Amino acid sequence: MSRTLLRFLEDGAMSDVTVVAGDSTFLGHKVILSLHSDYFYRLFNGDFTSPDTVTLDATDDAVRTVFTYMYAGCDGLNDRTIDDLQSIIVLADYLGITKLVDECVRRIVSKVDVLNCVGVYTFAETYHITDLQRAAKTFLTELLGSKEAFEELSQDDAVIALRETRNIVDRRSILRAILLWVRKCPDRIEQLKVLVAAVDDVDDDDNVYTIYERYAEELKDMIACPLSYNCVVVVDRDRYVRLINPDTLWSKRVTYIRKRAIGDRFTVVCMNNVLYCLGGTLDGAPTCDVLAYDLLTNEYSLMPEMGHYRRNASACIVNGYIYVVGGVDEENRLIGSVEYWQPGMEEWHDAPYLQANVETATVCYRNELWIVGGTVDLYHPTFISAVKKLTDNRWMSMEPLPEPRSGATTVVYNNRLYCIGGRIHGGAYTNHVYNYLDESRTWERVGDMANVRRNPSCCVYNKAIYVLGGNTNAVEKYNGWKWQEVGNISTYPACNNTAYPFFYTNDEI
C-alpha cells in the first residue's frame, strides 16, 4: 500500500493540487495532505474555495522529504545532516505534522556534540523546541571545558554558551573559558566586555584591560574543580562511606561510620568534599549532634550541635549554608523548626518556621531553599502537596504538586527542578517523576522510573540524573529523555542518605 501511494506522488496520477517550492513543483492529493497535515486540512476544508496551487517557503528537498513521509510513512532521515533536519522541522512544524517534528528532534539529539551544540541550542530556542533545547544545553557545560572548541567560537556563540551555563557551572570554569577565548586572538580583548556582560559581571567603570587583569588574578586563587566526576559518594548498606562509579560499578569503601559516634535515622549532606551526618538517634533517642567526615583528609570531627534534637530530618546545601528542615523530636513529635549553619560559625541559627513535617524533599533551586511535599501527621499519615521556597527570610508558596506526596527526592538537572518518587495516597510507593516549568509555574509529569521508591538518594553525575536506594538496590539513570537501569548498589536504609558527585584522584578507577 505504501509503495502504491508513493507511486501516486511520483507520477502525479489523479492529483488535484500543485505545491510549489522554489523552482520545483509537486503534484499532490488534497485528501492525503489533509490526513497528515493540520495546515492542509484547514486550507482544503474551509468555508471558502479550496486552492488548486499552494506555494511553500521551503527548499525542494525539505518538501520532498515531508511529502514522502505523508505518502509512504518512510522518513528518509537516517543520513540527513543537522542542517537538513532543521529545515525539515521548520516545514513540518509549519504544516502541523507533529510526529515528523518529533522524529527529526530525536535524530538531531543523537548528533549533538560540543562542536555543534551552540547552533542546535539557538535553533531550538528560536523555534521553542524545549526537549531539543535541554538536550543541547547538556553539551554547553562540556563546551566550556574544551579549550580547542570554546576558543574557536564566534563572539555571538561564546556569549550564548556563557549566558546559558553561568548558573550551572562554577565561577572558575566561567573565568577560565573567557580568558582562553580572549587569548586566542590579540584583537579579542576589545570584545571582553561583551562576554563579561553575558555572565552579568560587567562594571561600566572598568576598561577591558582592568577586567582581564582582575579575572587572571582571581583565577590564580581558585581551587580547580572538575567539570566532570568519576564517582558518587554514598553511605552503603553496612554504614561504610563508599565511592562508586555508576557506569562501571567500580567501588571503594573509604571509612566506616561507627554507631557509637552516630546512631540511625541521621541525615547526610555533603559540601566541599565534607560529609555531614546530622542528628539521628543514639541509644534510641534523637540527638542534635553533627559529625563531619572530610573525604580528602580522611578525618572526622564534631561540629557545633543543632539547636533541636531531631531524627529523620531533611537537609540540603544553599549558598554555602547547611539547612535542616523538620523531622521528629525526642518526644516523637513532628518538628516545624528550620536551622542553618556554615563551617566557621559557632552555633546554628533559626530560619522561619514551617508547618511541622517529616520526609519533605529539600533542594537548592535558583539559589533558594525549596521544600516539596512531606508528612504532617505521624499517627494518621497525612501527606501534603505544598511547595514552598525561602525568599528574603520568609516562606513563599509555589505551585503545589499535582498530588500529595511524602518521601520524594528533588534535584536540579539542566536548570530544571525534578521531583522523583516518594509515597502517595494510601501510602503506596510511586515511580512518578515531575518537572517544574518556571514559564507556566506548573508541574509536568515526565517519564516514570522502572522502580517505585521512597526516600531515594539522587544526584546529577556527568550530565545525567542518578537515583539510588529507596527500598531497592537498583540504580537508574535519566538523560533527559528516558530512564535506564544501570546496575545494583545497596545504600544504608536507616538514614536520609546522600548521593554526591566526586572526583577521586587515585588511578584505581
Swiss-Prot record:
- The answer to whether keyword Hydrolase applies is no
Gene3D superfamilies in alphabetical order? Kelch-type beta propeller, Potassium Channel Kv1.1, Chain A
Where's the BTB domain? 15-79
> Keyword set for this entry?
Kelch repeat, Repeat
The highest taxon in the source lineage is Viruses
Give start and end residues of every Kelch repeat: 274-320, 321-368, 370-415, 416-463, 465-509
Q: Per its UniProt record, what Pfam families does this chain match?
A: BACK, BTB, Kelch_1
Please give the InterPro entries that the UniProt record associates with this protein.
Answer: BACK, BTB/POZ_dom, Kelch-typ_b-propeller, Kelch_1, SKP1/BTB/POZ_sf, Vaccinia_A55R
| Homology family | Belongs to the poxviruses Kelch family.
Q: What protein name applies here?
A: Kelch repeat protein M-T9
**Source organism (scientific name):** Myxoma virus (strain Lausanne) (MYXV)
